Amino acid sequence: MQEYISKQQQVLRPAEQIYAVISRFDNLTPALADKVEERQATEDSCSFKAKGFTVKLRMEEREPGKYVKVVGDDGGVPMDFAFWIQLQEVSAADTRLRLVLRIDLNMMMKMMIGNKLQGALDQIAEGIARAMNAAPQV
């Protein structure tokens, strides 16, 4: 399995506030509304179509204030993978966030999409941090 790790992002919130959002798919999927079709979500799973490809995901593990682990659900992505959204609270108003993706790619796929996966992880982490930093304080 190959591992891709995003650049660390700073979120000016306590880890528990960030966790409350990232630990539920029904909180996350509205951000995808203009990018995907046929979006459905519950607290623990979601599915959507992107560029004609159906994606099904489910939350496999949660550690409050620390991380969530997401895996492909049955009938979804045809590759074995897992990704984590990890949080490390530095202070009450400073949490570091990063994404880690472990995916089983053959050599050809790794050469074709490896750099794109790294770039996508960095963009997603940056987008989550930007959205959390821009949201009103609770």
What is each stretch, according to the model?
Residues 30, 35-78, 135:
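Glycine-rich portal/gate segments that line the openings of hydrophobic small-molecule binding cavities
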Residues 75-126, 130:
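Beta-strand/loop substructures that line and gate deep hydrophobic ligand-binding cavities in soluble
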Residues 18-22, 28, 46, 59, ...:
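Hydrophobic pocket/interface hotspot
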Residues 1, 38, 59-60, 86-89:
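Short secondary-structure boundary/capping segments
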Residues 129-138:
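Short, highly charged C-terminal tails/helix-capping segments
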Residues 9, 48, 57, 70, ...:
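Preference for bulky hydrophobic residues occupying beta-strand positions
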Residues 2-8, 45, 54, 67, ...:
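Intrinsic-disorder/low-complexity, polar/charged segments enriched in Ser/Thr/Lys/Arg/Asp/Glu/Gln
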Residues 1-40, 45:
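Hydrophobic ligand-binding cavity/cleft-lining segments
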